[in-house]
């Protein structure tokens, strides 16, 4: 009976967390459109955290920085280093974009582990990290694609499209396909890792509620940070590639 009870609890946990993805959604009806309310609510919370942190960081800057100012300056330097490494000397205008991507994904990922989303009851579905929803990760990947094309066109004009027939026109279909697979790989990598992390925690909490999930949660925090870094690094690399014009 204990085994059956554990199995039922595990299946219930898996059903609850997967409910965010398989149709148990909370929608807002605005005119003739259905708006995905779950993602908007959690995204607004993440944005509020970022804006609040930014306002604290710039409220009273000191010539001799204190601990909090040092922390935010370190984050800025880190983002600048990532951008410069991947984009090159023309990285400056892209630091805000890469930084926004990195910080939004990082805070979104960590919010899934640290914020008690599931305590908030909704008529349908449940709240979870914004990056736990494929809609969010696809939107972020499409933004990266727009930035990728904008960087290339602003640098080279219509001559940017000549890269599709280099080094030979035979590679035209492959080069076009590559630009479609980039946002797909970005979105599914981020979505899959975050969803898998939460599923593992749910299974372990159902089986061993007290001890085992704790180190797994710490591992999840670490991998969540790594996923944010990977996404931002690849976004910067794609932008740098489009400006340089080589693969």
Swiss-Prot record:
Its main location: plastid. Keywords: ATP synthesis, CF(0), Chloroplast, Hydrogen ion transport, Ion transport, Membrane, Plastid, Thylakoid, Transmembrane, Transmembrane helix, Transport. It is found in: Plastid, Chloroplast thylakoid membrane. Disulfide bonds: none annotated. One of its GO terms (molecular function) is proton-transporting ATP synthase activity, rotational mechanism. It comes from the Eukaryota. GO terms for cellular component: chloroplast thylakoid membrane; plasma membrane; proton-transporting ATP synthase complex. The chain crosses the membrane at residues 38-58, 95-115, 134-154, 199-219, 220-240. It is a multi-pass membrane protein. Coiled coil: none annotated. InterPro entries: ATP_syn_F0_a_bact/chloroplast, ATP_synth_F0_asu, ATP_synth_F0_asu_AS, F0_ATP_A_sf. The keyword Cell inner membrane does not apply. It holds the Pfam family ATP-synt_A. NCBIfam families: ATP_synt_6_or_A. Belongs to the ATPase A chain family. Key component of the proton channel; it plays a direct role in the translocation of protons across the membrane. F-type ATPases have 2 components, CF(1) - the catalytic core - and CF(0) - the membrane proton channel. CF(1) has five subunits: alpha(3), beta(3), gamma(1), delta(1), epsilon(1). CF(0) has four main subunits: a, b, b' and c. This is ATP synthase subunit a, chloroplastic. It comes from Oenothera argillicola (Appalachian evening primrose). The gene is atpI.
């Amino acid at each position: 009976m204990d085994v059956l009870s554990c199995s039922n609890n595990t299946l219930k946990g898996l059903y609850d967390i997967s409910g965010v993805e398989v149709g148990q959604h909370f929608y807002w009806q605005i005119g003739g459109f259905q708006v995905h309310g779950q993602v908007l609510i959690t995204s607004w919370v993440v944005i509020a955290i970022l804006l609040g942190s930014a306002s604290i960081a710039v409220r009273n800057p000191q010539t001799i920085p204190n601990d909090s100012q040092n922390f935010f300056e370190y984050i800025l330097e880190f983002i600048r280093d990532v951008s410069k490494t991947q984009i090159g000397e023309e990285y400056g205008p892209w630091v805000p974009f890469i930084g926004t991507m990195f910080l939004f994904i990082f805070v979104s990922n960590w919010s899934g582990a640290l914020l008690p989303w599931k305590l908030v009851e909704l008529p349908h579905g449940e709240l979870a990290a914004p990056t736990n929803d494929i809609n969010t990760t696809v939107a972020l990947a499409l933004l990266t694609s727009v930035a990728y094309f904008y960087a290339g066109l602003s640098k080279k004009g219509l001559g940017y499209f000549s890269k599709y027939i280099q080094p030979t026109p035979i590679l035209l279909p492959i080069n076009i396909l590559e630009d479609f697979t980039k946002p797909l790989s970005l979105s599914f990598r981020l979505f899959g890792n975050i969803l898998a992390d939460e599923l593992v925690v749910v299974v372990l909490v159902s089986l061993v509620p007290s001890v085992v999930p704790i180190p797994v949660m710490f591992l999840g925090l670490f991998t969540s940070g790594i996923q944010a870094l990977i996404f931002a690094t690849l976004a910067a690399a794609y932008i740098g590639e489009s400006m340089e014009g080589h693969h």
